[in-house]
UniProtKB/Swiss-Prot annotation:
The modification Phosphoserine is found at residue 128. Its EC number is 2.1.1.107, 1.3.1.76, 4.99.1.4. SUPFAM superfamilies: NAD(P)-binding Rossmann-fold domains, Siroheme synthase middle domains-like, Tetrapyrrole methylase. This is Siroheme synthase. Then it catalyzes the NAD-dependent ring dehydrogenation of precorrin-2 to yield sirohydrochlorin. Finally, it catalyzes the ferrochelation of sirohydrochlorin to yield siroheme. The keyword Phosphoprotein applies. One of its GO terms (biological process) is methylation. GO terms for molecular function: NAD binding; precorrin-2 dehydrogenase activity; sirohydrochlorin ferrochelatase activity; uroporphyrin-III C-methyltransferase activity. It comes from the Bacteria. Residues 1-203 are annotated as: Precorrin-2 dehydrogenase /sirohydrochlorin ferrochelatase. It catalyses: uroporphyrinogen III + 2 S-adenosyl-L-methionine = precorrin-2 + 2 S-adenosyl-L-homocysteine + H(+); precorrin-2 + NAD(+) = sirohydrochlorin + NADH + 2 H(+); siroheme + 2 H(+) = sirohydrochlorin + Fe(2+). S-adenosyl-L-methionine binds at residues 238, 314-316, 319, 344-345, 396, 425.
């Protein structure tokens, strides 16, 4: 190591920043968050530093630099665009053994400002020793995606209970095991879900159980009652793994067992914890690998045995995903659960095809419709879908394309209404076919698209040719003929 990483207490400590511009302001913001009492020394300062000075801890000296100003300071930062002045500040500080940082000049720095991941009181600093600041920043960005915001609250709770835990669990090994269980289980998930009161109650309950086991001289591991697990209903999005949420990825990587649908892509499934059991419970129209009631019971049984269960569903769990039915069953069984939203197929199909679902010139509302009812019968509520200024999205509608288009036209929607079929939205295999209600059936019969597919009906569909940016567009025969005639 060229530098030693340590954390420096600056609360109420005097710090001098020489400079009043953007560079000085960035350092001042960081030091202010650490509780330092900052003196800004500069003839002129930026508006941002003016705002910083509203904090009564901080002081402004509108003067040119003089070495008298560094006397008594804990650290000094030189952040001016005057190279000679920065060297002078460095020399004066070295003479008085005051740590100094000359911004963006590593040879003149006694210490370096790291890239910071702040989950106070959990703080991570990343440094490249001035060799590659951009790489340090990118490393920080990656860590930001991996560490939940709730880590800070979890650490504060642990700090508040540290003395009580120490008094009830006398051995270091016992305390380590206690905290590992708390940080890897129910307590942490409650905190991450924003249920801090319940998290504290769960931690106290865990402590009391452990204390009772120790008091009775029983083996903690043998006497530990089997804990009830939890179920995470996770939206896997439309297929592109980069469209997963951070929370979805975190829960997928700590699951003991994963029940996944047919619409979950292999790329997404591969991101689950490697040693988790992965069980296919897919459903395609009336062909169900496992009936819904059976899926509910599988989740209940697994969670009751103490497992962390991920129910991985394509798209969003609450948009034609039967997530509501599943959590009703979990609630009735007394199983704890969380629901993690995913990007629904309509959102992905819209964005990945350049077809906005709403547009001030074409559509002021949007309606999501399923092609089939609970009974398995086709949805026939076409009378409510005739507004020309409304976009209609049909999920699971490709197999009944002819019935849907005829129903819309019979109900009064213009035969010239644009329609788009989007197959495998967001994936490298995405395909798009456009047409009108009157001709889309013939086009699809001539060049059928694979499922899963979604239908977008409305004037916005005609924007695809203009705004498309991703994947392959199926050229219709009229366009091909026109193109040949132009040769």
């Amino acid at each position: 190591m060229n530098t030693f990483p340590l954390f420096f207490k600056l609360t109420n400590q005097p710090v001098l920043i020489v400079g009043g511009g953007e560079v000085a302001q960035r350092k001042a913001d960081l030091l202010s968050r650490a509780g330092a009492c900052i003196t800004i020394l500069a003839p002129q300062i930026s508006q941002e530093i003016h705002q910083l000075l509203s904090d009564e801890r901080h002081t402004l000296i509108t003067a040119h630099y003089d070495k008298k100003y560094i006397d008594g300071k804990r650290i000094v930062i030189a952040g001016t665009d005057d190279e000679a002045l920065n060297h002078q500040v460095h020399a004066d500080c070295k003479a008085l053994n005051i740590p100094v940082n000359v911004v963006d000049t590593p040879p003149l720095c006694d210490f370096i400002f790291p890239a910071i991941v702040d989950r106070n009181p959990i703080v991570i600093g990343i440094s490249s020793n001035g060799k590659a600041p951009v790489l340090a920043r990118l490393t920080r960005a990656r860590l930001e995606t991996l560490i939940p915001q709730g880590y800070g609250k979890l650490a504060k709770l642990a700090g508040d209970m540290r003395d009580e835990v120490k008094s009830k669990i006398p051995t270091l090994t016992g305390r380590r095991q206690f905290w590992e269980k708390a940080f890897e289980g129910k307590v942490s998930e409650l905190m991450f879900a924003g249920r801090s009161v319940e998290a504290e109650q769960a931690l106290k309950q865990q402590l009391e159980q452990t204390h009772q086991q120790l008091s009775s001289n029983s083996d903690v591991k043998q006497a530990d009652p089997k804990s009830v697990g939890e179920v995470y209903i996770v939206g896997a999005g439309p297929g592109d793994p980069e469209l997963l949420t951070f929370k979805a990825l975190r829960l997928m990587q700590q699951a003991d067992i994963v029940y996944y649908d047919a619409l979950v892509s292999r790329e997404v499934l591969d991101l689950c914890r490697r040693d988790a059991d992965k069980v296919f419970v897919g459903k395609k129209r009336s062909n169900h690998a496992v009936a819904q009631q059976g899926i509910n019971q599988l989740m209940i049984d697994a969670a009751s045995s103490g497992k962390r269960v991920v129910r991985l569903k394509g798209g969003d769990p609450f948009v034609f995903g039967r997530g509501g039915e599943e959590i009703q069953a979990l609630r009735a069984a007394g199983i704890a659960y969380q629901v993690v939203p995913g990007i629904t197929a309509a959102g992905a199909a819209s964005c990945y095809t350049g077809i906005p679902l709403t547009h001030r010139d074409y559509a002021q509302s949007v309606r999501f419709v399923t092609g089939f009812l609970k009974s398995g019968e086709p949805n026939t509520g076409f009378a409510a879908l005739t507004n020309p200024n409304e976009t209609v999205i049909f999920y699971m509608g490709l197999h009944s394309l002819e019935r849907l288009t005829k129903g819309l036209m019979d109900a009064g929607r213009s035969p010239q209404t644009p329609i788009a079929i989007i197959s495998q939205a967001s994936m490298p295999t995405q395909q798009v076919m456009t047409g009108t209600l009157a001709d889309i059936v013939a086009k699809h019969e001539a060049n059928p698209l694979p499922t899963p597919a979604l239908l977008i009906v409305g004037e916005v569909a005609k924007l695809h040719d203009e705004l498309a940016w991703y994947g392959e567009h199926i050229v219709n025969t009229d366009q091909q003929a026109h193109a040949l005639n132009m040769l």
